[in-house]
Amino acid sequence: AKNCILRTVHFLAEAAEAAGCPRGAISAISTPTMEATQELMKHKYTALILATGGGAMVKAAYPSGTPAIGVGAGNGPAFIDKSANVEQAVKRILDSKTFDNGTICASEQSIIVEQAMESAVVRELKRQGAFLLNEAQTKQLGGFILRANGTMNPKIVGKSCVRIAEYAGLSGIPADARVLVGRETGVGEGAPYSREKLAPILGLFV
């Protein structure tokens, strides 16, 4: 991840400089440590901190003396109502959730659908490559998403649908499934599909 970020920053910095930005306007710490991060946050030329990457990072930013915005855990739902372009909405949700197999915490974690739109949304999800789990599959995968202590199972993180199905002991999952969709009715600790899932897994609420 560090090398990917540094390479991305390199390309962004090159493009920014070519567009007229001062050299070094975009940069990154090449060897990230908490000490280096704290030094950067407290530097007199740092005007604003956007802290993400875990609770410890957010807590370290607030007392730094620099204005800070803390980012919490990502668990964003997408709401599809009667006015929506269903094809476009589903495409954007699936494109977001399949990027890097769902490891981006800002990607959608569940879909909330108005009852009148349920059939159209389910049909479009299937057409665009999502796999709708049946009740038994939903329950089985739901028991695998979280560990006994209530935290996300690291075995699902960034894995393909087929690999997740293999780990969870699910059968009948097609090799070309883009996202696994499980119906959910509750929220919170006892509702795994309502939680953050850094994997191509979505909860469906109607």
Predicted regions and their residues:
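Glycine/charged-rich beta-loop-alpha catalytic/anionic-binding loops adjacent to active sites
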Residues: 72-73, 197-199
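Short, contiguous strand/loop micro-motifs
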Residues: 44-46, 148, 201
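Hydrophobic alpha-helical segments and helix-packing faces
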Residues: 157, 194-197
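ALDH superfamily catalytic-core signature
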Residues: 15, 58-188
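Short, conserved catalytic or adaptor-binding loops enriched in Gly and charged residues
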Residues: 18-21, 170-173, 194-195
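Short, well-ordered beta-strand elements within core beta-sheets of diverse protein domains
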Residues: 110-113, 198-206
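Rossmann-like NAD(P) dinucleotide-binding subdomain of oxidoreductase/dehydrogenase enzymes
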Residues: 1-88
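Residue-level signal for inorganic ion chemistry
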Residues: 26, 49, 114, 164, ...
